[in-house]
Amino acid sequence: MATTKISSTKSTSRAINYAEKRAEEKSALNCDIDYAKSSFKATREMYGKTDGNEGHVVIQSFKPNEVTPEQCNQLGLELAEKIAPNHQVAVYTHNDTDHVHNHIVINSIDLETGKKFNNNKKALHDIRQANDEICVSHNLSIPEEKAKLRYTQAEYSVLNKGKTSWKDEIRHAIDQSQAASYEELGNDLQQNGIKIERITDKTITYRHLEEDKKVRGKKLGEDYDKGGLEIGFNRQNEQREEQARQRELEQARREKIKRDKEREKEWARFNRSTQAIRQNRERSEREERERERKARELEEQNRRAREERARQERENKHTHEKTRGFDLEL
């Protein structure tokens, strides 16, 4: 029986240090196991992806006495090849607890695309499915109570041949859908040649149109029955509500920016208007002062002219009187 879980890590170096310290077996994919830390770092730097999560750690555990450490490590490497074929992966096997288990450290960068490994619900689903397929191919048990997928022996036979069953096509179509209701799910499935045949209070039945075969959701696994679907619908609705809220916040932010810019423009227009008024007033005051100065100068000139005329008149009068007195003496 093999179980898996996945977590993200901010430091692959710390994850490797911890895993390597107690490793009984170790192996690697797309890198040298003895230089895994430096290889991981060099790849992230080459693609400029040095922020955020540096990698992910998958814990693959087996029940006691089911596999040897050597077998466990080989199964871990096989899982790595299935779930992260284009990533650098280091596999470390521990045997210091009651069950042997692997620490599978995955570098975040895809060597071909440069994109990061997407650790989400689908990734966990794919890891568990791949792990189940590996266990079946090696005649190992699967924890039925924890299995998200339910395969028949016929499906396992198809999987072992490297083919995809019609039931897996239904699972894949449901996994790809982002529906938030049965109506939306039905529309998505219809585009993939699958029909929701029947929905009751407790069950849902699908039909694969090309194969003309039906199957109940619970036969596919708990994620595909009504309970699992409705959990997914609720999660999708919550995501949509959150996205709508974020859009509203973004719209409000943009409107505020727009209002602030308009306010800045209004203040700029007001400042320009105020400046123009001040400049006009100052110009008027200068012109008024200039007129007053010229008026004073003109008044001063007139005063001096009057004084000059008065002086001339006095001199003329004095001269006339002197001339008259001289004439009388003669």
UniProtKB/Swiss-Prot annotation:
Q: Would I find Cell membrane among this entry's keywords? A: no
Assigned keywords, A-Z: Plasmid
Which Pfam family, just one, is annotated for this protein? Relaxase
Region Disordered, residue ranges:
220-330
InterPro entries linked: Endonuclease_MobA/VirD2
- Amino acid composition bias (Basic and acidic residues), ranges on this chain: 237-269, 279-330
Q: What does this protein do?
A: This protein is probably required for relaxation complex formation and plasmid mobilization by conjugative plasmids.
Instruction: Identify this protein by name.
Output: Protein rlx
* Organism, as annotated: Staphylococcus aureus
